[in-house]
Amino acid sequence: WSKIDIDVCGPLALQRCLIVYPWTQRYFGSFGDLSTVAAIMGNPKVAQHGVVALTGLRTALDHMDEIKSTYAALSVLHSEKLHVDPDNFRLLCECLTIVIAGKMGKKLSPDMQAAWQKYLCAVVSALGRQYH
């Protein structure tokens, strides 16, 4: 995590997710104009939520032995109030991995990527737990 700039990678990951998977935009109706790539890339609410999402993702590091309970409230919020399709967590994590790979280049070794993917899978599972 020390190599990840949350203020840069968070917005880039969410922007990429909204552009590559446009159906994910339906959960962000209150964010204003998301009609074009330029609108998404310049939207301060998208950028802010990207930081929030990555900050939340970072929380799991401090609670590795209790990831599911750490994300229990967020799981309930996203499933029962926001009605977010849990597959969107996976899509966002895929976009985040691409952003991080772009930033780190060759420094992101296969072993590091494997550990990163395992971490993300645990968090995505915890966030989707309420849906099961």
From Swiss-Prot:
Residues involved in heme b binding = H49, H78
Note the Gene3D superfamilies from the entry. Answer: Globins
In which tissues has expression of this protein been reported? Red blood cells.
Disulfide pairs here are none
| Keyword tags | Heme, Iron, Metal-binding, Oxygen transport, Transport
Question: Could you give one GO CC term from the UniProt record?
Answer: blood microparticle
Task: Please list the residue ranges annotated as the Globin domain.
Answer: 1-132
**Pfam families reported for this sequence:** Globin
Q: What does this protein do?
A: Involved in oxygen transport from gills to the various peripheral tissues.
Entries under PANTHER family matching the protein: HEMOGLOBIN FAMILY MEMBER, HEMOGLOBIN SUBUNIT EPSILON
Q: What's the name of the protein? A: Hemoglobin subunit beta-1
Q: Which organism is it from?
A: Arctogadus glacialis
Q: Which gene encodes it?
A: hbb1
